[in-house]
Amino acid sequence: MMAGGTLAAVDPGREKCGFAVLDAHGTVLFQKVIETLNLVHEINDKYDRYAFRVLVLGNGTTSKEAKERIEEMLPDLRVALVDEYRTTDMAKRAYWQARPPRGWRRLLPVSMLVPPEPVDDFVAIILARRFLEGAASGDV
């Protein structure tokens, strides 16, 4: 299904969203935390650049509204809902792997640290990889 293509993922929120574009192997091509008001513009911009055919959307509380807006804007784009369970915890760990703590913070267990910036973009990456794993196993 995803052979050779790209996919986008969104962790929708009321004020901000995580957004990421990955290739079929799960390599991150783009990631960003964006204001929800700019979501449609950002998706459109990256759609033109990366030509993804699937957009993975976290199934949280604002997913229905986000799905409707995206499908209205890009009717040919397949929007797939993915379970968000525990993705925030996973995203915090991924954040610290990508940006290891410095100074005295490196002495603390990562589970005790709070990232200094939103991790919604890392959540989007996790959602995309969950989708890819499901596609590889035939669950999607």
Regions found by a protein language model. Give the residues of each.
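Phosphate- and other anionic-substrate recognition elements at nucleic-acid/protein interfaces
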Residues: 2-10, 14-140
